[in-house]
């Protein structure tokens, strides 16, 4: 679950710096619950769309600053693999999505990539058409088992 979507759908698309802290805290609770469910069900993998690195980039990109809580959680979280989607497909409005400008999308891609590299986190770039992306993601995930 992506808590930000639920929040913005419920309360409106206007948000501020402190709103992002609330969203991050709720998202972190959902991630913990999802992890526990995956462990209890003996699943090898579980998938998270929005985690604390996303929240960190969102805060820094929009507000030029980030809450200490988000940074601390981002540094402590552990995931086996990040799937970093390259912005080489058309942007599609979904009612909540921001940054239709290609330059901003590329800038954000490089921002995420630089953080992943700086923290030496395992990631793969998912690019190409919609049809090409899913097999690439599946292949990358299959290397984990």
Task: Label every PLM stretch briefly.
Residues 7-10, 51-56, 87-93:
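Short, basic/glycine-rich phosphate-binding loops at helix/coil junctions
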Residues 22, 26-29, 111, 136, ...:
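Alpha-helical elements of Rossmann-like donor-binding domains used by nucleotide-donor carbohydrate transfer enzymes
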Residues 1, 48-50, 85:
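Active-site flanking residues adjacent to catalytic metal/cofactor-binding acidic residues
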Residues 62-132:
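A glycine- and Lys/Arg-enriched "phosphate-lid" helix/loop adjacent to the NTP-binding pocket
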Residues 1-28, 32:
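Conserved substrate/cofactor phosphate-moiety recognition/catalytic segment
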Residues 126, 130-145:
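Basic, glycine-rich
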Residues 21-78:
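Glycine-rich phosphate-binding loop used to anchor ATP phosphates in small-molecule kinases
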């Amino acid at each position: 679950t992506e808590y930000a979507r639920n929040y913005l759908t419920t309360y409106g698309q206007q948000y501020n710096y402190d709103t992002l802290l609330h969203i991050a805290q709720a998202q972190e609770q959902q991630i913990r619950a999802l992890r526990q469910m995956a462990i209890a069900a003996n699943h090898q993998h579980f998938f998270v769309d929005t985690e604390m690195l996303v929240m960190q980039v969102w805060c820094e990109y929009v507000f030029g600053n980030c809450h200490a809580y988000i940074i601390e959680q981002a540094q402590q979280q552990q995931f086996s693999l990040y799937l970093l989607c390259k912005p080489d497909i058309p942007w599609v409005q979904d009612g909540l999505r921001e940054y239709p400008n290609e330059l901003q999308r590329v800038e954000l891609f490089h921002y995420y990539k630089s953080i992943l590299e700086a923290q030496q986190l395992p990631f793969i770039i998912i690019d190409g058409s919609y049809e090409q992306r899913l097999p690439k993601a599946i292949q990358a995930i299959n290397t984990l088992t």
